[in-house]
Amino acid sequence: MIIKPKIRGFICTNSHPVGCAENVKRQIEFVRNKPAITNGPKNVLVIGCSTGYGLASRITAAFGSEAHTLGVCFEKEPTEKKTATAGWYNTAAFHQEANKAGLAFHSINGDAFSDEIKQESIDYIKQNMGKIDLVVYSLASPKRKDPDSGEVYSSVLKPIGKQYTTKTYNTDKDQVHEVTLDPATDEDIANTVKVMGGEDWERWVKALHNAGVLAENCQTTAYTYIGKKLTLPIYGHATIGRAKEDLDRAASELVAECDDLNLKAYVSSLKALVTQASSAIPVMPLYISLIYKVMKEEGTHEGCIEQIYRLFTEGLYNSNPELDEAGRLHMDGYETNDKTQAKIEALWEQVTQDNFHQLADYEGYHQEFLHLFGFGFDNVDYDADIDPKVNW
C-alpha cells in the first residue's frame, strides 16, 4: 500500500515501516559516532522500549555498550490493510540492526502493568541473561489495570486547586487559542498517581529482586519532566506532577528494599520534546515549539537520543554524577536555566495566532512529530508501494 500520514487531533493514526526504520537507524548512527560508554551496562531491561526516551535508552545500551537488551512494549501488529503502530516498526528495525551488529536482544509485546508480562520477562532473563545491571522504566499510558484488584484506572491531565486558563496550540487546526482546564478532583489525582506514579516501577524492580535476577550494584531509573514556570500549572502543580512526585517516593523505597545489592535508583529529569506522550498535553505543543526556536538559536537543542546518551555518560555511568537536592539526575539544564527560560517567557507573552509561525519553530515541531510515525524523512520514498506487514 501507499502510506501517507493520517493525522487526527494530536495523534497520527498510521505509521510508515521504512520511515520508522530510518528514524531508528539515525539514532543508532548517532550513538555509533560517539565514544563507547565506559563501564557501561551489559544486561539491560527497558520497560517501554519502543518509542521516545525508552527506545533511545535501548539503542544507547545496545550500540553504545554492546548490551544484551530485553525490551517490553505494547504495540499493535500490522494487518494486510492497516499499518502497525510506530513502536512495532521501531522494534522491528531495532531487531534488524541489532542482529546485523551481532548483538543479543529479545522483545516482549504485552501489558507491562500485568504480573504475567513481569513473569515472562523474569523467565527470559533467567534462561538467557543471567542478571540485569540496568532497569529503565519509560512507560507512558493513559490507563493501568491494577493486577491485584483488576480495577482499571485512568490518568487525567488537570491542574490542582483551581481552574487554569492559558494559551495552547492546536496542531490539527494550526491555531493558537486559549484553553481553560478545570481542576482535578481528589479521585482524579489518586487515579493519575496510580497510572503514572511509581507503583508499577516498584512492582517491576521488586519482582526482579525477589526472583534473584538483579546484579549487585544494579541501577534503575524512571524518567520524568519537571519543567519551570510556564509548564508548572499543567505539569508540576498538576495531576501529572503529583504522579511524577510519587516516583521520588518509589526511588527511595527501592534503594531500601534492595540494599543487599547496593542498588541505585534514580529519577531522571529530561527535557521537553515532541513525543507521542507530550503531544497529548495541553500547553506543551506551544511551549515546545518555542523552546525549539530558542534552543536551536542557542545551539543547545537535543532530541531523545542526544539526551539519553548524555544521561548514560554523564549520569548513570559517571562515577560522580551530579544530583539535585532530591537525588535526581538532570539532563534538562539547557532548557531550564534562567537565561533560556527568560527568552521563552518573553516569546510566550508575545505569541498570538498572527505571529506564531514567526516566533516559534513550528516547522521543527511538526517535522519531529511526523518523524515519530516514520513520515517526513527526505530520503524515504512515500509514493512507493510498501508492504505494511513487518514481523519481529
Swiss-Prot record:
Leading EC class: oxidoreductase
Residue positions of the active site: Y235 (proton donor)
Binding site for NAD(+): 48-53, 74-75, 111-112, 139-140, 244, 273-275
Catalysed reactions, semicolon-separated: a 2,3-saturated acyl-[ACP] + NAD(+) = a (2E)-enoyl-[ACP] + NADH + H(+)
EC id: 1.3.1.9
UniProt keyword annotation of Lipid biosynthesis present: yes
Listed InterPro entries: Eno_Rdtase_FAD-bd_dom, Enoyl-CoA_Rdtase_cat_dom, FabV-like_NADH_b, Trans-2-enoyl-CoA_reductase
GO molecular function, one term: enoyl-[acyl-carrier-protein] reductase (NADH) activity
Biological pathway: Lipid metabolism; fatty acid biosynthesis
UniProt-annotated binding residues for substrate: Y225
Residue(s) at site: Plays an important role in discriminating NADH against NADPH: E75
Listed HAMAP family: FabV_reductase
Subunit structure: Monomer.
Known role: Involved in the final reduction of the elongation cycle of fatty acid synthesis (FAS II). Catalyzes the reduction of a carbon-carbon double bond in an enoyl moiety that is covalently linked to an acyl carrier protein (ACP).
UniProt xrefs under NCBIfam families: EnoyACPredFabV, PRK13656.1
Name of protein: Enoyl-[acyl-carrier-protein] reductase [NADH]
The species this protein was found in: Idiomarina loihiensis (strain ATCC BAA-735 / DSM 15497 / L2-TR)
This protein's encoding gene: fabV
